[in-house]
Amino acid sequence: MKRLHGFVFAALTAVLAPVQAAEDSPASSAAATVAPLHAPKAARKKKAPPAHDPAAFRYVNIAGFGEVAVYKPAGESRGLALFASGDGGWNLGVLDMAHEAVGLGYWVAGFATPQFLKALDAAEGECSDADGWIAKLSDAIVRAFGLPIDTKPIVIGYSSGATVVYAVLAEDAGHTLGGGVSLGFCPDLLIKKPFCPGRGGLTQQKQQVAPFGYVFDKRETVQAPWRILQGEADQVCDPKFAPAFVEGQADAKAVMLPKVGHGFGVPKNWMPQYRDSVREVLEAKH
C-alpha cells in the first residue's frame, strides 16, 4: 500500500495576483562521476525550481487551500477542473497534466493537497467535510473569474490527490460534481480525523499501526463519471485497487498502463490515455 498522507468555511477570500516569471527547471545531473585528477572547480549552484508556473493565468489565495494556480483555456471554456496535487504540492509532474486539461477547454484550478488536508484536520468538527470545501473552492473560482454560475466542476488528482478525488465523488454521490480522474490511486490518506459520510455514506477505517491514517472503504456511490489511470509498475499504490474500486460504480473505468510507475515519469506512456479520459468525462457531463 502507498504512503499514508496527510468547514465550515470561516472565511473564503480570493485575491488575484500576477503570475511571477520563473527560471527553467534544471536538467538532472549524472548519477555518478569519476574523481578528477586536478582540483575541481567550484561547484555550480543549481537553479531553484520555479515558485510559480509561468503558464498559469493567475494565482489566487483561498482560505483552506492556500495559493491556487488558475489556468485559462485559449478558446471557448468547456468547464472547470479542480486539480488536487500529490504530496509534492503544485509543481513538476502535475503541471503537464493541468496544461493538457486546459488544452481540452477546461479552466483549471490547481491546489496543493497537503495544504488542503492540513486545513481539513485543523477545522472544527469530528469529521472533515471535504466535499463541501471542494464545492466552495469551485464557487470561489466561478465568482472570481466570471464562469457560468451553474458550472458543475470535475475533479482531477494525482497520488494523494487521486484519493481525494474518490473520496469527494463518493461523498457527493453525483449532486454537485460532474466527474473525476484519478492518476496513481490507492485508498489511504494521512489524515488525523475521518472524512464526513456526505450524501453517499462514505466510510473509512483507522489504521492501527503508524502513521495511523485512514483507509477509505469502497462505496458504490460514485454517480458521476470516474476514470482511474493506474500504472501496472506502480510500487507505491497496489494496482489491484483501481479495478476493484471502479466495479459497481455508475460510470467508472480503470485504465491500466503497462509501462508506468507511480511517478508517471514518461508522458508518452500515459498522456494519450489521460487525454482520452478527461475528454470522456467532459463529454459525459454535457
Predicted segments with their positions:
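N-terminal cap/lid segment of alpha/beta-hydrolase-fold proteins
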Residues: 33-76
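Short, surface-exposed "cap/lid" segments of acyl-processing enzymes
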Residues: 74-106, 110
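Acidic beta-to-alpha connecting loop that harbors the catalytic carboxylate
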Residues: 84, 232-234, 259-261
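Alpha/beta-hydrolase active-site loop
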Residues: 124-147
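Primarily recognizes the serine-hydrolase "nucleophile elbow" in alpha/beta-hydrolase
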Residues: 140-212
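The feature captures the conserved acid-bearing segment of alpha/beta-hydrolase catalytic domains
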Residues: 190-248
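Catalytic histidine-centered segment of alpha/beta-hydrolase-like enzymes
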Residues: 260-271
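Catalytic active-site module of serine/aspartate enzymes centered on a nucleophile-bearing elbow/loop
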Residues: 269-286
